């Protein structure tokens, strides 16, 4: 394995990322594979921090799968510090398009994303630009949850009374 560290011989490790040219998130600069190659078209999460009185570092987010496993995170949830009035964009690899996922917004101070002003927002879009989650998160909370599915769920059996011709995933 090319990426390692040793307690007695500290060194700067090689850049990690996806080293498979066939993946959508291939990183030509990566020397070590981080195991996070994405072979599906990723969703895009756009975050705008607005004027946060210098406290945008409290903002964070996670995307969890149906089992509660974290598949992506950013901001304070990922030791990343946000700045006020700044746009951030993330590609999120979803492997099971028929599953239900949870976008969780965090405010570690507990006063919401729009403490000093309005305008902080999160928007999750699919590869075609369709909005799956859009919010301007208001004041006075420490966590907000938004459930979403990358595909339309419903009855895919054309002989059933509740058949949904637009459904891609059968919801049982």
Regions found by a protein language model. Give the residues of each.
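Primarily marks secretory-pathway-exposed extracellular/lumenal segments that are disulfide-
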Residues: 1-172
